[in-house]
């Protein structure tokens, strides 16, 4: 459940198909996490909820609309008093991000990966890896 006392400044959304999740490798053009694998994510705009930010970032990076049902997975501290909110949605078919997405340049590769410690790509932040493994 989203905390009402934490200051969320970024959010992300994982698309889950059976035991697979969609991840993208951050391009070298990205200021944050260049070369790392992650879910579509980004900064929360002023007056935007963490869930809305996660949905918006997912669309901007993949050109795919998030399903109606999105669930809170976890959060983790980024720095000092700032937190990252992570959501997930179940999908009934594989989706493929479009090169026409608003922020398509943020990723240089996409893939579906099995939710298992030894199946996730590297490099990836410890916080992202630990959060993904909670989906098992």
Feature annotation, model-predicted:
Residues 1-22:
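Conserved N-terminal beta-strand and adjoining loop/helix that marks the start
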Residues 3-5, 29, 77, 100:
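Generic marker of residues within folded, mature protein domains
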Residues 6-8, 16, 31-32, 79-82, ...:
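A generic fold-level signal
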Residues 15-17, 25, 90-91, 114:
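Residue-level signal for short segments within beta-strands and strand-turn junctions
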């Amino acid at each position: 459940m989203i905390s009402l006392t934490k200051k969320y400044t970024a959010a992300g959304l994982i698309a889950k198909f059976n035991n697979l999740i969609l991840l993208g490798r951050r391009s070298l053009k990205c200021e944050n996490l260049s070369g790392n694998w992650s879910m579509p994510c980004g900064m929360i705009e002023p007056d935007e909820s963490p869930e809305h930010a996660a949905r918006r970032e997912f669309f901007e990076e993949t050109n795919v609309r998030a399903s109606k049902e999105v669930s809170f997975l976890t959060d983790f501290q980024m720095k000092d008093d700032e937190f990252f909110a992570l959501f997930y949605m179940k999908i009934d078919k594989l989706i493929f991000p479009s090169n026409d997405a608003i922020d398509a340049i943020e990723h240089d590769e996409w893939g579906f990966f099995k939710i298992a410690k030894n199946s996730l790509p590297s490099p990836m932040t410890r916080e992202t890896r630990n959060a993904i493994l909670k989906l098992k």
